[in-house]
């Protein structure tokens, strides 16, 4: 009876822990920020001397530039992995389609990560700031040599060159975008040449602008974080929600860090050169838009001199091998919650097995088998305890009938029975306790790992990261739960009996919302548990039968002697 109560409590705890995990991930302490005066500015101050920054214009296109809007052009760049558009207005990256990732499991249309013509808006911006009103920021009009670039066979990279000039001051700026084959990285380089008579002093900035996802974008039963994030060696990985940006604006000097806008499976991130100190900032803009970026220190370019400002933009899936190549800490953007220490080894194991078998579903089955083998002895102890509980079930029923409503006397008599039969009433709960963190860790692995996005298994399961479209796996899982209950000792309390009978139905309904890969894990785990429990119970019954036969034979022999 105690075993059943514990099982019921732990089973329901799975639901509570999943809900708590979602709440905990969404209500972490906000990033420490500096209070700043609210403004509509979308151009940052320089890293080292923010008080010297010129007054920036607001986020709208200045009146002096509105007549030039018609001159804006879009430069299309197509590689083996990306199809993107760069606007000559500021050189913004305003559209990015990921050619190797479909919109859904059944729609091969490339997934659009960045766009400026829909909700949510998501674009990348960069520019240079100096003391002049005419400056090459993200509102300036650049010139492009061509309207389209395509990576041809035999080519390893594409370079897109945009130019801007202030003839009155003799300042010439070239912005060069470089995209490599088999890469989601866009290298951005500002080249400043001073052909004038006076020195030029300015700084660069690199930022991401987006707004929150519209309500209803993701189902209520799937929680993923969408918002900003920064990394620094001192404070490690920090998430910055849009609400945090509304409350306060970040302004922090960071060396050897990065800043990103992250969402489910994908991210856009500025990753500056190593050891470069930059000022990281956030802004809440009008129109429900938010800016996260970084600005460099001022540089001085003497007449006849040149200077460069460089950065890297990653726009793509959170594939951990690629992220690790960019920066050791970039894999932290794949957020597995408070069980990261368990989830990362699980993903590593899944990933390596998948490399061998070539199927993520088969990898999940094999990982489940390995986990079961790792805890085989622990589970065996539990199932032996359950088998003993089942064997003394008739005697427990007699105790209940004898003591009636005297629960204290009943509990005392049951404890004496447990002691006499050497039964640990809590022995069956330990494997369940062990499975709960594994279950939750695997849940986040399946939910957060883009490697499993749209990963097929077999037959009707074409996406292990989404729910079973025909609910076959949840129904089978519910059937295995019901079968497991038949192997366990039944509760003495009629109310508990009804609750335990309803539990497989409740869990079947809940698992209909879970990713198919997670249901597959639970189904296989239940099947292996049933097989192990049946094997142990059969052996114990054989042992008991052998003991009874020996005892009977001994009694007969004794009678013959008498």
From Swiss-Prot:
Q: What compartments host this protein?
A: Cell inner membrane
State a single Gene Ontology molecular function: membrane insertase activity
Query: What Pfam families does the annotation carry?
Result: 60KD_IMP, YidC_periplas
Please give the chief subcellular localization of this protein. membrane
Enumerate the Gene Ontology biological process terms. protein insertion into membrane; protein transport
Stretches with biased composition (Basic and acidic residues):
61-71
Where is the region Disordered? 33-71
Q: Name one GO cellular component term.
A: plasma membrane
* Gene3D superfamilies noted in UniProt: 2.70.98.90
Per the record, membrane topology reads:
Multi-pass membrane protein
Q: Where are the transmembrane segments?
A: 4-24, 330-350, 356-376, 426-446, 499-519
Q: Which UniProt keywords apply?
A: Cell inner membrane, Cell membrane, Chaperone, Membrane, Protein transport, Transmembrane, Transmembrane helix, Transport
Show the ranges annotated as biased composition (Acidic residues): 35-58
Q: Which family does it belong to?
A: Belongs to the OXA1/ALB3/YidC family. Type 1 subfamily.
Give a short account of what the protein does.
Required for the insertion and/or proper folding and/or complex formation of integral membrane proteins into the membrane. Involved in integration of membrane proteins that insert both dependently and independently of the Sec translocase complex, as well as at least some lipoproteins. Aids folding of multispanning membrane proteins.
Q: How does it assemble?
A: Interacts with the Sec translocase complex via SecD. Specifically interacts with transmembrane segments of nascent integral membrane proteins during membrane integration.
Q: Entry's NCBIfam families?
A: PRK01318.1-3 (NF002352), PRK01318.1-4 (NF002353), yidC_nterm (TIGR03593), yidC_oxa1_cterm (TIGR03592)
Q: What is this protein called?
A: Membrane protein insertase YidC
* Species name: Alkalilimnicola ehrlichii (strain ATCC BAA-1101 / DSM 17681 / MLHE-1)
